[in-house]
Each structure stands twice: as structure tokens, then as C-alpha cells.
Amino acid sequence: MSTGISSDLHLHPRALNFSKTSKSGLSNRKVSFSSVGYAQNRKLSCSVSSTENVAPKDDDRGKDRPLVKMCGITSARDAAMAVEAGADFIGMIIWPHSKRSISLSVAKDISQVAREGGAKPVGVFVEDDENTILRAADSSDLELVQLHGNSSRAAFSRLVRERKVIYVLNANEDGKLLNVVPEEDGHLADWILVDSATGGRYLDQLLSFFALSHCNVFLRGTSYTITLVHETVCLSQVTEISRV
């Protein structure tokens, strides 16, 4: 897993946007993105422009625009900036061995800022057991828990009945999935995050997974392009895809 700050971009199948700065609704097509693609009838076009005051109103979050998740937030101040910029999910690393790990008290402050701004606080856990995760989630007022590592994922079936869950699948550099979603309760996951720690393109290997998945999906990688994501959406016909 990556322990630095990252951003996840939720994509609707006909609207593709990558951003390093800020974002706006797609209805007026005004953007301040590093690059933008808009997919319609399987055609791809790109444009760049600038705008101001692009942070969405709370009522507009998730409507006809990308959903963004910022991860690795370490302070309430940074969380406020992320929310102001339009982030929909604020991720915090609770795992103590990360250089960006934070205390539960700081996580609670971040959660409060996120919720007040209309965003959802997410806690990242690695190799933690059920009780540890639930205690931390309660203490920090988390909306979702993100499960990395075998120990954390082993508690999924119990956790998903208590909390909203982002279930993490790992992929190697060749795009092969190294673990699977549990058959019994996998459909209960709120999000699936496909994590490629080494980056890499794994489109072909994951198309069948996307096509069969009934969950929202995050993709984590370093070599995604607008064309590649457009291709993924068109070929897999998934409802939603996200990029880290």
C-alpha cells in the first residue's frame, strides 16, 4: 500500500476527469484540471481551462461530477483545505507503522472537519483485528474503514455489519489479483479498491472483474491515462470506477 498523500477520482462511465488541483461540476464543463477527457459515444476529447470557486456545494456532491478521495491527511487544517477543494472522502492512516500515521484524537478532529464540510472520513487499517478497528472507528467517528492486510480483511464479514467498508484487493505488476473478495459477504462491501503498489497497467486482467462487480471500484496505480480509463469504462461497462 502507499502511505503518502493520494487522491482517488470516482468516474461516471460517460464523464472522465483527472485532476491535480481542483474540480467543478461537469454540467458547465468548467475545469481547472491538469487534463480532462469527456467520453460520449466512445469518443474521447481533451481540454484544459481555468476557473475559480469550483468547490461543490454540499447538495451537489456526487451529482454529475467525479467523486474525489484524498488519503494520507494528517491534520484538521489539511482536511479543511481538502474539503474546500471539493474532496468527498478524507482518508487517514490509522496504521501505526506508516510515516503518515495519526493518533485517534487527531483522526477525530479530522473526521469532524470532514463531516462538517459534507465529506466522509475514511480510516486506513493494516493487519488490525476486528476489535481494534471498531474501537478506532468509534473513537474517531469514521464513516468508512479501509482494509489492507490479511488480518484486517479476515474481519470483513463481521466489520461490514457494523461499518461501511472499503475492501482492498492487491494486484502485482502483471495485473494479477493476489486476493479475492469473500464469496459469502463480498456483495456487502461499499467499495472495492484495487491496489497496485508498484503501479502498472492491469486493464486486461481486470475487465472481467469489473464486469461482474456490483460494487463501486477504486483503482490505485501510477500509469493510468485518460485513454486507458476511457477504454476500461467502455469495455467493462462498469457503473463507477475510481483512480488513486
UniProtKB/Swiss-Prot annotation:
One of its GO terms (cellular component) is chloroplast. It holds the Pfam family PRAI. Keywords: Amino-acid biosynthesis, Aromatic amino acid biosynthesis, Chloroplast, Isomerase, Plastid, Transit peptide, Tryptophan biosynthesis. Transmembrane segments: none annotated. Residues 1-32 form a transit peptide. Its EC number is 5.3.1.24. Pathway: Amino-acid biosynthesis; L-tryptophan biosynthesis; L-tryptophan from chorismate: step 3/5. GO terms for molecular function: phosphoribosylanthranilate isomerase activity. GO terms for biological process: L-tryptophan biosynthetic process; response to UV. It is an enzyme of class 5 (isomerase). It catalyses: N-(5-phospho-beta-D-ribosyl)anthranilate = 1-(2-carboxyphenylamino)-1-deoxy-D-ribulose 5-phosphate. It is found in: Plastid, Chloroplast. Gene3D superfamilies: Aldolase class I. PANTHER family: N-(5'-PHOSPHORIBOSYL)ANTHRANILATE ISOMERASE. Belongs to the TrpF family. This is N-(5'-phosphoribosyl)anthranilate isomerase 3, chloroplastic. It comes from Arabidopsis thaliana.
